Amino acid sequence: MEYRSLTLDDFLSRFQLLRPQINRETLNHRQAAVLIPIVRRPQPGLLLTQRSIHLRKHAGQVAFPGGAVDDTDASAIAAALREAEEEVAIPPSAVEVIGVLPPVDSVTGYQVTPVVGIIPPDLPYRASEDEVSAVFEMPLAQALHLGRYHPLDIYRRGDSHRVWLSWYEQYFVWGMTAGIIRELALQIGVKP
C-alpha cells in the first residue's frame, strides 16, 4: 500500500476489511484505553498529545488521549472517550468509533485497548493544563509509514522488550504510542 496517497476512504475501507483479531491472554488485569483520533480530512490527520512534564508517569511523552478504565465506564471504549474529553475537550458525541486494535500490555501493568475513532476537522481542542502540554496533528500517511520507526531492544527485569522510536517535527514518538501506530499501519495492510 502506498502511504503517501492515503485518503480517509482508503483508510476506512482497509480498516473495515481487515477487522482486528482480539484473542490475547494477558498478565495485566488493570484495564486502560486510549483513543486514536483520526481527523476527517481529504488527507486525514492523527491527533496526538504531549503529556505534561509535571505528571508522575510518562511525563513529557507523546501519547494518545487515554487512561485507566474507571468503575463508572461501561467499557474500554467509554473510558477512551471520557479521557479524550477530559484531556483535550473532544466531546464523545463527536467521535465516530470505527473499531479497536488488539490490547497492548504496558510496562506499568495495564492492558491498554486502542480505540480507533474519526473526529471532525474543526474541533476546538483545549488541552487540560494538568495533563497535557501540547496537542498536535500529524498527517496520517506519514504516521503510518513504517520506515520512520526504528527498533530499540530494552532489557528489563531479565526480559527483552522491543520499543519503536520516531520523530515528528520537534516531537519524539516512542514506546507504546509508536507501537500502537505501527500496529494500526500493519492492520490496514501497510507493508514493512
UniProtKB/Swiss-Prot annotation:
Taxonomic superkingdom: Bacteria
NCBIfam families: PRK10707.1
Alphabetic keyword roster: Hydrolase, Magnesium, Manganese, Metal-binding
Family per record: Belongs to the Nudix hydrolase family. PCD1 subfamily.
GO BP term, example: nucleoside diphosphate metabolic process
Protein name: Uncharacterized Nudix hydrolase NudL
Residues annotated to bind Mg(2+): 83, 87
HAMAP family according to UniProt: Nudix_NudL (MF_01592)
Organism: Escherichia coli (strain K12)
UniProt motif Nudix box: location: 67-89
Residue ranges of every copy of the Nudix hydrolase domain listed in the record: 29-160
EC number: 3.6.1.-
InterPro entries referenced in this protein's UniProt entry, alphabetically: CoAse, NUDIX_hydrolase-like_dom_sf, NUDIX_hydrolase_dom, NUDIX_hydrolase_NudL_CS, Nudix_NudL
